[in-house]
Curated annotation (Swiss-Prot):
Cellular location(s): Nucleus
ZnF locations on chain (NF-X1-type): 453-471, 506-525, 567-586, 632-655, 694-713, 721-740, 832-854, 863-884
Primary localization class, coarse: nucleus
Protein name from the UniProt record: Transcriptional repressor NF-X1
Protein source organism: Homo sapiens (Human)
Biased composition (Basic and acidic residues): 142-159, 188-202, 222-254, 282-291
Gene3D superfamilies found in the cross-reference section: R3H-like domain
Described purpose of this protein according to its UniProt entry: Binds to the X-box motif of MHC class II genes and represses their expression. May play an important role in regulating the duration of an inflammatory response by limiting the period in which MHC class II molecules are induced by interferon-gamma. Isoform 3 binds to the X-box motif of TERT promoter and represses its expression. Together with PABPC1 or PABPC4, isoform 1 acts as a coactivator for TERT expression. Mediates E2-dependent ubiquitination.
Subunit structure: Isoform 1 interacts with PABPC1 and PABPC4.
């Protein structure tokens, strides 16, 4: 194959060639069907771009593509270098995405058939030489090759170059088979099996054959068959789709400018214009076409007549006409549909892969778990989770009955209890691997909510919102004059550019606005109207008070009419009213009674009253009391006129009326003459004590009559920001969020983190992860982050510091700790010089502005104990009683007692006083007694306690033991062990239940004797369950007997088990019951002590004293 010269610039295709039909709509019906299938499958595939078009071509290199499409026309008739068919490209050639010639599958199929036919024609041409000679002469005359218009070269075509000069995309390889249509790598891509070749009689007349052009096929029928193949296919399609019509023939569309309506041989689908995605061709590109030759024009006439293609320029004008384009942009519809499909597809993908999380429990939603889907936001939740949420207090709607969705806050009335599929037709749907989880697998059939669409969703049961209805409908504009094709379910109303011209509310004028929805605006023409009486006029809009005109006026001014009545004597007293005025009420034929209405005039005429002739004659009076009701008084007592029957208004009332205050709390009596109106009231001085609506303040209004006491004060409470106060009227509940905002950047202290404006009031500075850059008191390393507080956190670096009293040098002390106490006493010498500070290690002075109050340690002169008075450094010790405690004992040493020192000395003084009393006789005889020796320091220390009865009994026992030569170590009288075995608490508990103690002691004695006499080294006894006090007695007695005691079980079945051990368990010499009985018995009186006294040295003693000083018999004084 000869190679064409290189091409520079853009490709030029001959727009007049047969194969270059940029806006061919021959197969629009099939394209519409394919497009509808693509729309219905978009959600399932989540693929929003149409599949790549079929390109019937071979894999031709880029250089060969340039050679194929490059050819110049030579007017001189010279043959070009390239023998291949070439086309002059127009700049408007589209990319592979457009629906031009190279994207039409039916065109490729037709080219394939033409290719076979031309091959047959070429074989016949080679066999006949005369035909070849004629063919060469024809070429020289016309200067063109027949193969320029042969469709067989279309198989060499590839995707057209982009208008911007981009490299064309790689063409798709097709594998030819005996099936219908081409197959892409074994896959059937397009099937067009209904095309048939038209019969020869369907072809056009022979005059359509171009002059000077010889076809390779010498047969005329073969020539017609090749030329009219496209036309026959088009006729076949029109028979299959008789309802199709071009877009400009849609009902309600306006005619295209510069074009007469075509004959309707067949109707095309109304959506064909919407399915065509081919962009308009610029007018500049149309003007750049080269001039057509005569041959080209004739060839174009034949081709246009055979294939009935649409003119390119007219199609461009139709697409650019703004009146023909639908008012709803398809781009916006695709955008909305894409958002819906993205939401639904995302839900399907996440539910299928189990990656969707429940917003309540934050757990993954499994394919087998029961779920519930919100019909407002389409979020999916676990059924159990949404039940718990719906019953929780947090889900309750404010002021409404129902519960709120956790995602969209949509209020629902009923709590879901059943697990249903997304469309709601099947309960408890079973999960299938081939279906969407939680769906029933049937068609959705849900209606579009809130839209005027009769169609239902035709997708399978799915989560998320249903896609918009894909159907189209013809909708009338608001004024009803034009109709437009719009998407079904579109809530947008259609408007045309015509005026409305509906009758306005006045009924006279027409609406001059453009086509609009709703009612027309009231008529805006201003008219001047006069009232019925003619005294007042006004300017109103046309249509105001329609139907109220009486021919003279149009409204009532609410003034007295004042027109002259027919009588000519009186004027109309009614309020301004439509004509005519009523008759004069004083006419004789109208007046039937006296002025008070109690007596008819006929009776008065019989009594001699004169008859009335005109309205000016007075009405006769009956002479009775008028009795007409007056406006004063009350409902219980109505005041009446007290005058005699009279004409005109009744006079003032002479009685009094009781009126109430505004709040009806108090009443007041006033003369009727002072009442100016029937509803006369006054204000009392009672203040309202009810709470205002804010709940914080009281009303406090005087004579309040309000039902809702609104608070006029300003709230004034601080808002959450802490900087501003609420400026709204005082209200209940929490204040609103502070609406103040700053338009300055809010940064952290170091400036690394920034919050850009607007910044709501009260917003805290952003958190920063950088290290704090402030100047710190210490030079230790900084470990805390940047912060907004004024003070940095304390430094925690461990250091060594002295305590406050300089006692210890402590380690591991945080740097921020300053005053450290070691916990030891201060021991610093106080200013008094005698004492030391007793406080723990502290800071500062030991005593601040206060004297030392520690006790004085100076020994007393009389007893030697310290002074113990508050510290008195500069003064002598005060004379006070010594409060030190000393130990006193009796003469035998058995009794010991701690006594205050001053009390001990007073006891000695009492003893000394008794001794002085014995010498009182000497004082009576004139003698003197020296008492200085009675109270001495030594004698004070020798103070003793008096022996008691036990001391005497113990003394007797000692003497008896000495008499029988019994050693004291043997303890014959059980003096040391008798009181040491049993404790005081055991004795007190045993006194409460002696019988129980006796039984326990018997059991223990038996147990101890059994283990000592038996063969076993241990033996146990279990006591029955008992209370805590009895168990404590058993434990204490077990210690006395040398037994082991353990408590088992729990209350109230807790008991004690005692165990006797040989060699350890011993019975005490005296039982506890015996000790208690001896103590409880009455003691015998103690023996009378006998003291030996020396003979009285005083010769003057009386005989009475001698008798009293008899010797005391000592029964234990055994003398040898």
């Amino acid at each position: 194959m000869a190679e064409a010269p290189p091409v520079s610039g853009t490709f030029k295709f001959n727009t007049d060639a047969a194969e270059f039909i940029p806006q061919e709509k021959k197969n629009s019906g099939l394209n519409c069907g394919t497009q509808r299938r693509l729309d219905s499958n978009r959600i399932g595939r989540r693929n929003y771009s149409s599949p790549p078009p079929c390109h019937l071509s071979r894999q031709v290199p880029y250089d060969e593509i340039s050679a194929v499409h490059q050819h110049s026309y030579h007017p001189s008739g010279s043959k070009p270098k390239s023998q291949q068919t070439s086309f002059q490209s127009s700049p408007c050639n589209k990319s592979p995405k457009s629906h031009g010639l190279q994207n039409q599958p039916w065109q490729k199929l037709r080219n394939e058939k033409h290719h076979i036919r031309v091959k047959k024609a070429q074989s016949l041409a080679e066999q006949t030489s005369d035909t070849a000679g004629l063919e060469s002469s024809t070429r020289s005359e016309s200067g063109t090759d027949l193969r320029e218009h042969s469709p067989s070269e279309s198989e060499k075509e590839v995707v057209g170059a982009d208008p911007r000069g981009a490299k064309p995309k790689k063409a798709t390889q097709f594998v030819y088979s005996y099936g219908r249509g081409p197959k892409v790598k074994g896959k059937l891509k397009c099937e067009w099996s209904n095309r048939t070749t038209p019969k020869p009689e369907d072809a056009g007349p022979e005059s359509t054959k171009p002059v000077g052009v010889f076809h390779p096929d010498s047969s005329e029928a073969s020539s017609r068959k090749g030329v009219l193949d496209g036309y026959g296919a088009r006729r076949n399609e029109q028979r299959r789709y008789p309802q199709k019509r071009p877009p400009w023939e849609v009902e309600g569309a306006r005619p295209r400018p510069g074009r007469n309506p075509p004959k309707q041989e067949g109707h095309r689908h109304t959506n064909a214009g919407h399915r065509n995605n081919m962009g308009p061709i610029p007018k500049d590109d149309l003007n750049e076409r080269p001039a057509k030759s005569t041959c080209d024009s004739e060839n174009l006439a034949v081709i246009n007549k055979s294939s009935r293609r649409v003119d390119q320029e007219k199609c461009t004008v139709r697409r650019q006409d703004p009146q023909v384009v639908s008012p709803f942009s398809r781009g916006k519809q695709n955008h909305v549909l894409k958002n819906v499909e993205t939401h639904t597809g995302s839900l399907i993908e996440q539910l299928t892969t189990e990656k969707y999380e429940c917003m309540v429990c934050c757990e993954l939603v499994r394919v087998t778990a029961p779920v519930w889907s919100c019909q407002s936001c389409y979020h999916v939740f676990h059924l159990n989770c949404i039940k718990k949420w719906a019953r929780s207090p947090a889900s309750q709607a404010d002021g409404q009955s129902g519960w709120r969705c956790p995602a969209c806050q949509n209020v629902s009335a009923h709590v879901p209890n059943t697990y249903t599929c997304f469309c709601g037709k099947v309960k408890n749907p079973e999960w299938s691997r081939n279906e969407i989880p939680h769906s029933c697998g049937e068609v959705c059939r849900k209606k579009q909510p809130g839209q005027d669409c009769p169609h239902s969703c035709n997708l399978l049961c799915h989560p998320g919102p249903c896609p918009p209805c894909p159907a189209f409908m013809t909708k009338t504009c608001e004024c009803g004059r034009t109709r437009h094709t719009v998407r079904c379910g579109q809530a947008v109303s259609v408007h045309c550019s015509n005026p409305c011209e509906n009758i306005l509310n006045c009924g006279q004028h027409q609406c001059a606005e453009l086509c609009h929805g709703g009612q027309c605006q009231p008529c805006q023409i201003i008219l001047n109207q006069v009232c019925y009486c003619g005294s007042t006029s006004r300017d109103v809009l046309c249509g105001t008070d329609v139907g109220k005109s009486d021919g003279f006026g149009d409204f009532s001014c609410l003034k007295i009419c004042g027109k002259d009545l027919k009588c000519g004597n009186h004027t109309c007293s009614q309020v301004c009213h439509p004509q005519p005025c009523q008759q004069c009420p004083r006419l004789p034929q109208l007046v039937r009674c006296c002025p008070c209405g109690q007596t008819p005039l006929s009776q008065l005429l019989e009594l001699g009253s004169s008859s009335r002739k005109t309205c000016m004659d007075p009405v006769p009076s009956c002479g009775k009391v008028c009795g007409k009701p007056l406006p004063c008084g009350s409902l219980d007592f109505i005041h009446t006129c007290e005058k005699l029957c009279h004409e005109g208004d009744c006079g003032p009332c002479s009685r009094t009326s009781v009126i109430s205050c505004r709040c009806s709390f108090r009443t007041k009596e006033l003369p009727c003459t002072s009442l100016k109106s029937e509803d006369a009231t006054f204000m009392c001085d009672k203040r309202c004590n009810k709470k205002r609506l804010c709940g914080r303040h009281k009303c406090n209004e005087i004579c309040c009559v309000d039902k809702e006491h609104k608070c006029p004060l300003i709230c004034g409470r601080k808002l959450r920001c802490g900087l501003h106060r609420c400026e709204e009227p005082c209200h209940r509940g929490n204040c609103q969020t502070c609406w103040q905002a700053s338009f300055d950047e809010l940064t952290c202290h170091c400036g690394a983190s920034v919050i850009y404006p607007p910044v709501p009031c009260g917003t805290r500075p952003p958190e920063c992860t950088q290290t704090c850059a402030r100047v710190h008191e210490c030079d230790h390393p900084v470990y805390h982050s940047c912060h907004s507080e004024e003070k940095c956190p304390p430094c925690t670096f461990l250091t060594q510091k002295w305590c406050m009293g300089k006692h210890e040098f402590r380690s591991n002390i945080p740097c921020h700790l300053v005053d450290i106490s070691c916990g030891l006493p201060c021991s610093a010498t106080l200013p008094c010089g005698m004492h030391k500070c007793q406080r723990l290690c502290h800071k500062g002075e030991c005593l601040v502005d206060e004297p030392c109050k520690q006790p004085c340690t100076t020994p007393r002169a009389d007893c030697g104990h310290p002074c113990m008075a508050p510290c008195h450094t500069s003064s002598p010790c005060p004379v006070t009683a010594c409060k030190a405690k000393v130990e006193l004992q009796c003469e035998c040493g058995r009794r010991k007692e701690m006594v205050i020192c001053s009390e001990a000395s007073s006891t000695y003084q009492r003893i000394a006083a008794i001794s002085m009393a014995s010498k009182i006789t000497d004082m009576q005889l004139g003698g003197s007694v020296e008492i200085s020796k009675l109270i001495t320091k030594k004698e004070v220390h020798q103070a003793r306690l008096e022996c008691d009865e036990e001391c005497s009994a113990l003394e007797r026992k000692k003497r008896l033991a000495e008499a029988f030569h019994i050693s004291e170590d043997s303890d014959p009288f059980n003096i040391r062990s008798s009181g040491s075995k049993f404790s005081d608490s055991l004795k007190e508990d045993a006194r409460k239940d002696l019988k129980f103690v006796s039984d326990v002691e018997k059991e223990m004695e038996t147990l101890v004797e059994a283990v000592n006499k038996g063969k076993n080294s241990k033996k146990s006894h279990s006591f029955p369950p008992m209370n805590r006090d009895h168990r404590r007695i058993i434990h204490d007695l077990a210690q006395v007997y040398g037994l082991e005691s353990v408590s088992y079980d729990s209350e109230p079945k807790r008991n004690v088990v005692v165990t006797a051990i040989r060699g350890k368990s011993v019975c005490p010499p005296t039982t506890l019951t015996g000790v208690l009985e001896r103590e409880m018995q009455a003691r015998p009186p103690p023996p009378i002590p006998h003291h030996r006294h020396q003979s009285d040295k005083n010769p003057g003693s009386s005989n009475l004293q001698k008798i009293t000083k008899e010797p005391i018999i000592d029964y234990f004084d055994v003398q040898d």
